[in-house]
Amino acid sequence: MNNLKWVAYFLKSRMNWIFWILFLNFLMLGISLIDYDFPIDSLFYIVSLNLSLTMIFLLLTYFKEVKLYKHFDKDKEIEEIKHKDLAETPFQRHTVDYLYRQISAHKEKVVEQQLQLNMHEQTITEFVHDIKTPVTAMKLLIDQEKNQERKQALLYEWSRINSMLDTQLYITRLESQRKDMYFDYVSLKRMVIDEIQLTRHISQVKGIGFDVDFKVDDYVYTDIKWCRMIIRQILSNALKYSENFNIEIGTELNDQHVSLYIKDYGRGISKKDMPRIFERGFTSTANRNETTSSGMGLYLVNSVKDQLGIHLQVTSTVGKGTTVRLIFPLQNEIVERMSEVTNLSF
């Protein structure tokens, strides 16, 4: 079937030749009908010989010219085609040389842009780490504040700044996340409690408590740093859009897969917004005056979940709240996924 495709392509590209040769042969036949002295047997012999030689010529040309395009069809690198001299005709060599020059130029640009991106990532990473020092010092100063009301307000704003810095750091590291992952068995409960501790100043100001219920063995095979980032972003959203309600957090076991659910009783997500919640920079269309949301939290979660093998489910009702469920993979599923990624990279 594949050979028929190449034959069809070849005949289509040589159709003008074929029509011209047929025209010349029919022209000779037409002349023979006018000139009665022209021996008809000789003419048929000439036409038959001409068509036979044309068929042989087309076959030889087909096998010679289609070879290069079959290499293209197999996705061979242009460097291999050029260095192995797989182009047969002068036009093919010229085409291969042109493609080689263009692809080489584009590769140089890609390398240059990648270096710039790496420098940009390094600059932002260094900036975030540098600014963390005065932010940490600020926390020590806030802890010395004796006015509890003022202290609580300052801790609330400090927590927001610290969270935004962490988010920016993770956004910067998105491109290199594969190199930055280390899988091991870790406790979901421990990760959740650590993240709750980080948000306690915000939850206290907003009158939000946490109902934590871990019913099953909560150890999962994942990368602790990136998994905590996902939990942090989901908790941040739950806190951001809730007030004076408890957030329910717990684990369940379905088909040997541990799942973590985080349920809030906040404003909820409308049906028209639901398909777009993972888009970069998207914020709710229901509250256009909302200035505290950057639209990056769920984008980050969506960008990382596949690398961790996590299946994400979001259900929501406007005015009643949102439930986010993280379904964790088994260890062998992670190993299989990493093997596939490694094979693709080669």
Curated annotation (Swiss-Prot):
Q: Which reaction does it catalyse?
A: ATP + protein L-histidine = ADP + protein N-phospho-L-histidine
Spans traversing the lipid bilayer: 15-35, 43-63
Checking InterPro entries in the record gives:
2-comp_sensor_kinase (IPR050351), HATPase_C_sf (IPR036890), His_kinase_dom (IPR005467), HisK_dim/P_sf (IPR036097), Sig_transdc_His_kin-like_C (IPR004358)
Stated EC number for the protein is 2.7.13.3
- SMART domains found in the cross-reference section: HATPase_c (SM00387)
Report if keyword Repressor is assigned: no
Q: What does this protein do?
A: Member of the two-component regulatory system GraR/GraS involved in resistance against cationic antimicrobial peptides (CAMPs). Functions as a sensor protein kinase which phosphorylates GraR through the auxiliary protein GraX. In turn, GraR up-regulates many genes such as adhesins, exoproteins, transporters, toxins, and proteins involved in cell wall synthesis. Down-regulates the expression of many genes involved in RNA and amino acid synthesis or glycolysis.
Query: What name goes with this protein?
Result: Sensor protein kinase GraS
From which organism does this entry originate?
A: Staphylococcus aureus (strain Newman)
- The gene designation is graS
